[in-house]
């Protein structure tokens, strides 16, 4: 080979010129060995690419991917064709400002697929670790572990304003409304709710959106060393590890402080007094309607349950309360007095469509710091409201949710949002824009038409009673069939008794949860309430919905008169939403 300066020679020829020179000095056998080594390296690289593509497909990142082997074969054929077509063409892969060539695009796609697969695997590991702890329905009457963990972390819960929400029903919907109102004013928001529908990440939301997978993983890794310390401290004193819900609460408060949020909207897990969330100072306390639920842990009477829930009221706090049963009201008033708190309470009763609260009563409510739903009108996709607070009257507010109970949830949310600004009225346009954006997945949600299929997460008689009123008001279906499953600790007879007058039949179905009631037990109770001639069962949700639709459509009435209601649990609501392609 000439010693002349090689500049001017195509750089891609360097390795071939050098290889030719080396062949003068080494044996043919050695050259063959090197060629085999190069081929092996290339084969390994191709296999690595194939595995990355497999991860991409298996992870469902390619929509409608179909059969895995067929997709892989097709992708490999496409890649081979791409490279064959480029074999005799100049390399333009790096031409153009900031525009990657096709080769780079392939590499980037494969790298992204591998990265996302790694994130999914790590998220599954983190979730498994958290879920290995005591479940959230096993209340541990102590805040010591949580307070110790937060103290180690610098008490992140003290860095933001908070709205703390308890009650038996309506907590999540109210939380979502408060968050939208706060966000509409320009505040950075955090939201902590439970349980989740589709992913554990829903429980911790920033600016209305679930925390990212990477963010959830990072939050766990930030607090894990502290959780380990607290577990060890508790074990040393004969106590339990931190529970599933305690860990999530610590993660949420840490995320909110790091983001940082201006306000956190925090829903209690269960009860209030001993709930892990109850370490917030000077939070606005919201108490939605109280009824019987979780009686094993909270008490067997409304008064006992209300006592536990009123435990979130802190000295000097503003308390926003729904209208309550007499026993619950007594407990709330006592807690307000003990803490010298300011009470703003819903004083309006049920307001039917096209009716308006008496103007004198409306004025009296405002003068006494009361709250009221002054009027409701039916609207396509929801309802139009007039809401009265101590600060203002808000007219022509569109709420894209059904049911009078959602109107009252909106009233509580509005008063809570006002409390963040010293009780002052919010601009009407902000209120209208915020409520128009509200969603509440799995709460009287229409997932299909023809026939109408509704999904609701209601699981206790108190919530189902409110739902029944909303159904009769907004969905006047002549032929409604219920698809039902429930957790074993729920009042199944009470729930079915509420729905029996408006449902022609019930289809019982098993549910994917270790806490679910056995199908045979469910059918037995349904037989007692509906009569065996109106009870059916199916082994899976797909068949249950199909059977329910057939039963609902069996009459000669027009199709809009028929419907299916899927109800009984958040778990069932999630499975139903996924069945109809809804995961957000």
Question: Which residue ranges define each predicted feature?
Answer:
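Acidic, Mg2+-coordinating active-site environments of NTP-dependent enzymes
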Residues: 7-27, 34-35, 45-50, 56-59, ...
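C-terminal helical cap/extension that packs against the catalytic core
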Residues: 325-343, 452-454, 461, 496-562
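ATP-dependent carboxylate-amine ligase catalytic core
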Residues: 118, 137, 143, 147-151, ...
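Active-site-proximal loop/hinge segments that shape catalytic or ion-binding/gating pockets
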Residues: 569
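Glycine-rich phosphate-binding loop signature in dinucleotide/nucleotide-binding domains
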Residues: 256-262, 423, 474-478, 548-563
């Amino acid at each position: 080979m000439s010693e002349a300066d090689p500049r001017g020679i195509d750089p891609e020829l360097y390795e071939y010129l050098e290889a030719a020179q080396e062949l003068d000095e080494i044996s043919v056998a050695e050259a063959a060995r090197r060629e085999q080594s190069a081929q092996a390296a290339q084969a390994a690289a191709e296999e690595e690419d194939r595995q990355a593509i497999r991860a991409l497909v298996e992870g469902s990142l390619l929509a409608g991917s179909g059969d895995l082997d067929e997709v892989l074969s097709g992708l490999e054929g496409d890649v081979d064709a791409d490279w064959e077509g480029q074999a005799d063409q100049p390399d333009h892969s790096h031409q153009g400002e900031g525009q990657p060539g096709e080769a780079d695009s392939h590499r980037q796609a494969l790298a992204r697929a591998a990265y996302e697969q790694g994130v999914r695997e790590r998220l599954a590991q983190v979730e498994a670790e958290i879920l290995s702890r005591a479940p959230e329905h096993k209340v541990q009457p102590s805040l010591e572990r949580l307070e110790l963990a937060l103290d180690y972390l610098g008490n992140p819960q003290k860095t933001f304003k908070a709205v703390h929400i308890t009650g038996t029903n309506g907590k999540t919907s109210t939380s979502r409304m408060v968050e939208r109102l706060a966000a509409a004013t320009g505040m950075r928001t955090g939201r902590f709710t439970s349980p989740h529908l589709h992913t554990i990440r829903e429980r911790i939301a920033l600016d209305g959106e679930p925390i990212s997978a990477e963010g959830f993983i990072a939050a766990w890794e930030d607090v894990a060393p502290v959780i380990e310390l607290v577990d060890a401290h508790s074990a040393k004193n004969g106590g339990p590890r931190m529970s599933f819900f305690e860990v999530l609460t610590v993660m949420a408060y840490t995320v909110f402080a790091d983001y940082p949020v201006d306000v956190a909207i925090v829903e209690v897990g269960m009860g209030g007094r001993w709930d892990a969330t109850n370490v917030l100072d000077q939070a606005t306390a919201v108490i939605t309607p109280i009824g019987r639920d979780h009686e094993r842990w909270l008490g067997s009477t409304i008064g006992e349950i209300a006592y536990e829930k009123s435990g979130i009221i802190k000295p000097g706090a503003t308390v926003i309360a729904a209208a309550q049963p007499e026993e619950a009201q007594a407990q709330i008033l006592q807690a307000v007095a003990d803490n010298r708190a300011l009470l703003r309470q819903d004083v309006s009763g049920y307001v039917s469509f096209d009716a308006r609260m008496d103007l004198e009563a409306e004025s009296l409510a405002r003068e006494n710091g009361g709250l009221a739903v002054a009027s409701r009108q039916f609207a396509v996709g929801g309802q139009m409201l007039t809401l009265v607070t101590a600060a203002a009257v808000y007219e022509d507010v569109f709420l894209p949710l059904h049911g009078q109970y959602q109107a009252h949830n909106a009233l509580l949310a509005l008063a809570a949002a006002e409390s963040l600004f010293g009780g002052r009225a919010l601009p009407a346009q902000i209120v209208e824009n915020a409520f128009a954006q509200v969603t509440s997945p799995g709460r009287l949600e229409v997932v299909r038409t023809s026939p109408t299929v509704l999904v609701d997460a209601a699981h206790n008689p108190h919530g189902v009673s409110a739902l029944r009123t909303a159904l009769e008001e907004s969905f006047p279906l002549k032929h409604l069939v219920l698809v039902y499953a429930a957790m074993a600790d729920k009042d199944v007879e009470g729930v079915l008794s509420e729905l029996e007058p408006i449902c022609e039949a019930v289809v019982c179905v098993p549910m994917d949860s270790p806490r679910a009631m056995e199908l045979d037990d469910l059918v037995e109770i349904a037989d007692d309430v509906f009569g065996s001639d109106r009870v059916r069962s199916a082994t899976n949700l797909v068949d249950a919905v199909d059977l329910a639709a057939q039963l609902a459509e069996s009459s000669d009435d027009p199709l809009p008169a028929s419907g299916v209601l899927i109800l009984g649990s958040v778990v069932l609501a999630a499975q139903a939403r996924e069945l109809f392609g809804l995961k957000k």
